């Protein structure tokens, strides 16, 4: 039944019909249907057990979402306020009621929002809803500080919330504040700015009780997704989509969750449901590319990424995405060239990511392609743009160290990176390896042991530690380190480790 959620739900429903007193089985049928995105079937099942005290939280939320979506606000609110269910869902009621009341009494709506306790699971969304309700009243100056606070709390929803506020400020007749909500070089924001500057809304409004409920559920899903367990966050996101089908951010978040749950086909369907005209379509394409890469469907990923870069409005993000796909295919030279195209677009004033990040990606790809002079130039450009970025300092320093180029300067770079990011095990590993290359074995052993303790699963750290221990004459301990490295090793690295375990450290088996 794993993966076939419709079949699972139907089976549970059949079992429930055979044993109507067993509400647990019925609840599982609803849960399976929701998780699989079979919302019509889930609603049919949930409505059949709506009066049951054993109705699951996902089924209850789906019934609320359906009532709000269809404009039956009083019934949806009553379901939220109903006592007897576990867990108690009434903490969602004040926000939803505020949106319902706000149609006729804005001040009463704001009073209802003030009833949400600071420690409530939806407490972080109060500023967001207050700003949106104030904007519905045309009070844009009052809304602005709450909007900015909400953006700061939005996390992974930041761009979506910025776009919603831009829409709301424009609708309230305040174009300057609408534009202020979407400042920045991000491609999503740049695309949105072009529309707002022309006085065109973005289609990203949060403008109804159903929209607000959808966003509440999406925020809860993201919060819960940080903990172990994927089923409830996925269910909440599916319900958020049902409450507000136009909420493309919910589709993108759902795709990311499904991909992490190793359901690539469902994830791709979610990403591909986002229309190309959406301001968030770039995020959806990023998710689609990552899902295809994780599923080893690299030809599909390449076709998609190349297609997007041939359009007249292709952006630096599109070129960077192509670079990511090519890098996943080990076509590193072409990946470096794609990142180079992205850099050129940003340098010409187009929207896109930070140039230092793109230069780092380009340098890394070219270094793997054995185009070291070009790689070094890109990495040095990244360092000039971001002289205190640990990733840049470490990458350039380590690349020089591997080539025996300015070894003293390379160690200084890596030591600086380690001082800036002492908790980063990979950088600590680089520092230990630099100390080894400089002949300071006791110091290198201590540093590499610290790195291994910080990230016990990283193969490279254990291999480095084993090499240094062996060189220091501590060969028994070296074998333990190499055996630990074998756990996650693949292909050439695994073969090198096996050779070391058989014959010890030689110039041919030394880590690069």
List PLM regions with ranges:
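Terminal, low-structured helical/coil segments at or just beyond the last alpha-helical repeat
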Residues: 201-216, 459, 471-512
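Amphipathic alpha-helical segments of tetratricopeptide repeats
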Residues: 17, 84-85, 151-152, 186-187, ...
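Structural motif corresponding to the intra-repeat A-B loop/turn of tetratricopeptide repeats
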Residues: 2, 36, 70, 103-105, ...
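Generic helix N-cap/helix-start motif at coil->alpha-helix transitions
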Residues: 19-26, 52-61, 71, 86-96, ...
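TPR-repeat structural position
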Residues: 5, 39, 73, 106-107, ...
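Residue-level recognition of tetratricopeptide repeat
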Residues: 31, 65, 97-99, 132, ...
